Amino acid sequence: MSRRRQIYEGKAKILYEGPEPGTIIQYFKDDATAFNAQKKGMISGKGVINNRVSEHIFTLLAGIGIPTHFIRRLNMREQLVKQVEIIPIEVVIRNVAAGSLSKRLGIEEGTPLPRTIIEYYYKDDALNDPMVADEHIACFGWATQEEMHDIADMAIRVNDFMSGLFAAINIRLVDFKLEFGRVWENDYSRVLLADEISPDGCRLWDMVTNEKLDKDRFRQDLGGEVEAYQEIARRLGLLPVEPDTEVLDLESHRKNRGL
C-alpha cells in the first residue's frame, strides 16, 4: 500500500494525510534533538516507545474527561489523530526546579516548588521559542481568553493525574510540556490536548535514585537513553518484564563519562 501524502515533518514526528477527512497519521521518529535542534542524534527505538507511552497516557486522560486529538494507535510507530489547528503556544508545567527555570532564577536543580508553575512559550524555532505572558497571547491573538482558561484548567488536571500516575511507579514528574489545538464545528471551536506526551517532553526522575529517565540523558550526554526510555515503558506496563530483568542501573554510563 502506498504511503499517504506527507503534510509536515518536525523534529520528532512526521504527519501524513489520514484515511478520513479531518484525520492525520502521526509517525514517531527515532531522531533526537536538543537546544532547538542545535544538537542532533538518534535514540534507537525511541519512536516506538513514545508512540506507546503517548497512546497510553492520552487514553487514560480521555477516561477522566480530558478532550484529546488521539483516536487510535495504528502500528508500532503510527497513530491516528484528529486534525486540529495548533495553537502556537507551548505550555510548560513545573513541579520541581530544573532546566531553564533553574538557570534563569538561580534555583538549585531538584528543589521542589512550593506551588505548580505554568509557563507559556511562543512556538517559533527562529526565535528559540521565547517565553511569553498571557498579555502577549491576548495582544497578538494567538488564543482567546476563553481558550487560555480552558488550557490552564486542562494543564492543571493533566498535571494532577500524571503526577499520581508516575508516583505510583516511583517516578517524579519534574516538569513537562503540552500542546493544544482547536477543532471547528460550524462557527464554534473547542480546545483539544494535542501532539504527544512521552519521555521526549517530560522530565522524569526515579524517586529513589534521582536518575533521569528522559531526554535530558541525551541533552546532557549522560548516555543510557535507550535504557531510560525502556524503563519508563516497563514501569507503565507497556513492555514485558522478563523474569531475570535487572533493576535499572545507569552506573556504567556514568563511569564511561568519568563521573
Curated annotation (Swiss-Prot):
It catalyses: 5-amino-1-(5-phospho-D-ribosyl)imidazole-4-carboxylate + L-aspartate + ATP = (2S)-2-[5-amino-1-(5-phospho-beta-D-ribosyl)imidazole-4-carboxamido]succinate + ADP + phosphate + 2 H(+). PANTHER family: MULTIFUNCTIONAL PROTEIN ADE2, SI:DKEY-6E2.2. Pfam families: SAICAR_synt. Keywords: ATP-binding, Ligase, Nucleotide-binding, Purine biosynthesis. Belongs to the SAICAR synthetase family. GO terms for biological process: 'de novo' IMP biosynthetic process; cobalamin biosynthetic process. Pathway: Purine metabolism; IMP biosynthesis via de novo pathway; 5-amino-1-(5-phospho-D-ribosyl)imidazole-4-carboxamide from 5-amino-1-(5-phospho-D-ribosyl)imidazole-4-carboxylate: step 1/2. This is Phosphoribosylaminoimidazole-succinocarboxamide synthase. GO terms for molecular function: ATP binding; phosphoribosylaminoimidazolesuccinocarboxamide synthase activity. One of its GO terms (cellular component) is cytosol.
